Each structure stands twice: as structure tokens, then as C-alpha cells.
Design a protein with these regions (language model features):
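Transmembrane alpha-helical segments of multi-pass membrane proteins
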Residues: 57-72, 156-165
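Alpha-helical membrane segments and adjacent membrane-interface helices in multi-pass membrane proteins
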Residues: 64-139
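Hydrophobic alpha-helical transmembrane segments
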Residues: 17-24, 45-50, 71-74, 112-116
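Membrane-helix interface segments
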Residues: 54-57, 97-102, 147-153
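Membrane-embedded alpha-helical hairpins and interfacial helices in multi-pass inner-membrane proteins
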Residues: 1-37, 77, 82, 117-123, ...
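Helix-loop-helix hairpins and the membrane-proximal interhelical loops
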Residues: 36-58, 62, 66
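Membrane-interfacial loop-to-transmembrane alpha-helix junctions, especially the N-terminal start
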Residues: 2-5, 55-61, 98-100, 223
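Alpha-helical transmembrane segments in multipass membrane proteins, preferentially the mid-helix core
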Residues: 43-47, 132-144
């Protein structure tokens, strides 16, 4: 089922590429945000609902979503750590790709009720959801590890790379589109502008990836232990 899910994700990314090309040609850049929301998010919610999850799993995901939103808002208004992203990654690692996507997408939607909703919301939901899927597929529901320290360090390194590439890559592209959509000049998109956006986003992306990895190093092992205990106790 995980390979089928990965195939669905790759198909969605292909559809997004086609939609992006169409948006660039027609200069309807905000159309792509709607395509992301409808074509990239709804199918994943349908996949989750189709398999009829048990109440114990839904409660666990609701708790992880609440924790993710809580720590993300706490850090965003106090210390500059991206603990919310770390919680999404840990959820996908322990509970699988579907759970990782649900927690990631729903958490980002709820976070933006505090931080501000806008055309960037579906993009952020998609990127957090994709992070949950990626780590759910890579680590296959947090299989038992013999060396916890080595596992958490490896997870932190993988988180740094994935957050920088996936989150940074998608959100910088989204910023490029939204900037042009809101510009009164209605100018055409250029490759040079995209490269400038990516270059300008490198410091933030490095900070985001680095603080996410730091959060995993700080409390990743504890969260993984608790989630695996819940899996064993309740058969999730």
C-alpha cells in the first residue's frame, strides 16, 4: 500500500507540473494554488477515509495534530525553533505515510488560523503533508532500532536534507508564483527571477532545516518511544 501511495504522490506532482506550466503560459498564477488544494490534498484525505480508520487511530492523530500546532505556535512566538515540522516528521516515521500526511496537512491549516490564512496555506499544507509521507515511506512506520542514538542522528540528518529540498523547494516556487499574481505589472515569469527567489530563500531554508533537525535530536527519541508504545498497546 505504501508503494501505491508513493505512486499517487508522484502522479500528483506530475499533475502539478502540468498545471504550473499552464499557469505560466496563461499568466493565471493563482490557479495553481487552487489546483494544489483540490488535486494534491483531497485525494489523500479520500485515501485515508476509504480505509475506515479505527477510533483509536483517529484519536492518536488528533492528539499529534494538537501537539504539533501547540509546539509550533509556542516556538513561533518565543524561540525560533521549527518543532512543528519535527512533529510531522516523527509522526510519519512512527505511524506511517498516511498518518504523517494527515497530521502535516491538518496541523498547517490550523496553525494558519493563528498565523494568517492566505493563498500560501494550501502550499504549506501540501509541503508538511509530503514530509509526513516521505518519512513514513522511508522509515516504514518506525521499525524497531537497535541503536536509538544512531537512529535519531540519522533521522535528524535526513530531516535536514528533506526539509531543505522539499519544503524549501516547493515554498520558494509558491512564493515566486504568488508574488507575480499580486503584482500589478502582470509581467511574465522568468527563470532568472526564480533563481533569485531560491537564492534569497536559502538562509531561511537552512534555518528551518537546521532547527527541525535540532528538535529531533532534542526530543525525537522520547516521542518515538511514546508513539511506539501506543502502537503496541492499542494495535495501531
Amino acid at each position: 500500500r505504501q508503494w501505491i501511495l508513493l505512486g499517487v504522490v508522484l502522479s500528483l506532482l506530475a499533475c502539478l507540473a502540468v498545471a504550473g506550466t499552464t499557469a505560466v503560459v496563461t499568466k493565471h498564477y493563482m490557479l495553481l494554488s487552487a489546483v494544489v488544494l483540490v488535486g494534491g490534498l483531497l485525494p489523500m484525505f479520500f485515501v485515508f477515509e476509504y480505509r475506515r480508520p479505527q477510533a483509536r487511530e483517529i484519536v492518536t492523530l488528533a492528539i499529534m495534530t494538537a501537539l504539533c500546532v501547540g509546539v509550533n505556535e509556542l516556538c513561533s512566538h518565543t524561540i525560533p525553533l521549527h518543532a512543528g515540522t519535527a512533529f510531522v516528521i516523527l509522526t510519519g516515521t512512527c505511524l506511517g505515510p498516511e498518518a504523517g500526511f494527515m497530521v502535516g496537512a491538518l496541523s498547517r491549516l490550523l496553525c494558519n488560523f493563528f498565523d494568517g490564512q492566505g493563498p500560501w496555506t494550501p502550499w504549506q499544507m501540501l509541503t508538511w503533508g509530503l514530509l509526513g509521507i516521505c518519512f513514513g515511506v522511508i522509515y516504514s512506520r518506525g521499525k524497531r532500532f537497535h541503536n536509538p542514538v544512531r537512529f535519531v542522528i540519522g533521522l535528524a540528518v535526513m530531516a535536514f536534507i528533506t526539509v531543505f529540498v522539499v519544503y524549501g523547494g516547493i515554498m520558494n516556487f509558491a512564493a515566486w508564483l504568488m508574488d507575480h499574481a499580486m503584482s500589478p505589472l502582470n509581467s511574465a515569469l522568468t527563470k532568472e527571477e526564480l533563481l533569485m527567489v531560491y537564492a534569497a530563500g536559502v538562509p531561511y531554508d537552512l534555518t528551518h532545516a537546521g532547527t527541525t533537525a535540532l528538535c529531533i535530536l532534542l526530543f525525537g527519541h522520547t516521542v518515538i518511544e511514546k508513539l511506539q508504545r501506543i502502537q503496541i498497546k492499542y494495535g495501531i
